């Protein structure tokens, strides 16, 4: 429980593969859910992270009270984020404003440039994408 009494959702690691990084993403999601339980509890949807490197995609499903993170793809996710792993990670370390990277900071401008230049593609539910960035934010 947090100081305001909110319990985080149950974050579970699902199927993993030899070429997957679901366990690493799981750690980020678990940390984010513990830090921002209200946000994690209100999120709903299927998210897929696809990497240009020879890595398995990571899929996340946010349901009532449960988040599952595992290696694998969705046929039709609500949100798909794709790009090179370091470029996708850059989105999680950029300071945010309004759920998007803050253009007033160097890291924020760098992350936005990766999206604007097509190095990172965000397809689908943009509101879910903003919530995911807030959940995964390192700071």
Model segments located where?
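Feature captures hydrophobic
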Residues: 2-139
């Amino acid at each position: 429980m947090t100081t305001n009494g909110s319990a985080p959702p149950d974050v579970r690691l699902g199927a993993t593969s030899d070429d997957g990084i679901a366990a690493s993403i799981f750690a980020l999601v678990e940390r984010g859910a513990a830090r921002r339980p209200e946000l994690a509890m209100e999120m709903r949807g299927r998210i897929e992270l696809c990497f240009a490197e020879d890595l398995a995609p990571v899929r996340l499903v946010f349901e009532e009270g449960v988040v599952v993170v595992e290696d694998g793809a969705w046929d039709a996710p609500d949100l798909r984020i794709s790009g090179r792993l370091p470029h996708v990670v850059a989105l999680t370390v950029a300071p945010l404003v309004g759920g998007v990277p803050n253009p007033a900071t160097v890291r924020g401008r760098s992350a936005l440039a990766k999206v604007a230049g097509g190095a990172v593609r965000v397809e689908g539910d943009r509101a879910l994408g903003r919530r995911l960035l807030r959940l995964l934010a390192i700071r």
